[in-house]
């Protein structure tokens, strides 16, 4: 499983000219049919049958580039984008992500396997998930992935496995943030309606402030474990920008608390995903979140970068 990430030239993207454009690479052609890039979807269905999943490589690349640029243009620091492999764990898309310089968020053995098979740099991969099995931990440690942990027991298991394998391992700590300021913000999720705080408290696992301090202190005493980051995932429960800014601010506040109580300042904060995507008015299924009026990437990036910079300066981090 060799590392081929970033070894190829940048792929040039050329927008298409449609009669009616849904994006630069999807639209209605002059013949009245739906087109994806240079392909008439009706002709594709005739050849491959229906239902048919079609992905625009150019749209995929463009979206990644726009998202990353929004943050690199607004944040005065290092930015790394991790693709959520669970969204589509195909070998082809993972290879495209490698070409674009994207890392990866992995759940389980299969997602790690595909990422490594595609030649992804293991240092850009993170293993997430609750109740990780020893098989997953061994695979992550053997290949040099960072592991986001959420319990003292998991820290102990990682220590034992890394010692057995004679490997060092980077870890992150998944936080259970106190999002009190979102108690009056309504959100939606697969578990039903409720405020964003209620949804977060009931569905997001992780460590409390006190538990985080305890686990950091324990990790500092283990020679083969290196602390890398803290992590939180708000999830796709709203398309408003401010809740994500609240989450980012709280993560920096926790960084200060951790530093004051352990001497360790997290060099990286992983702010998770859940970003709402926009779509053409009247297309696609209706959902509880208003995708048709979603903020743009730049809206998220400007506000979140502003908040992180303000809080970091406030606490001299």
Q: Where are the language model's segments positioned?
A:
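C-terminal active-site-proximal or functional interface alpha/beta core segments in diverse enzymes
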Residues: 10-12, 236-317
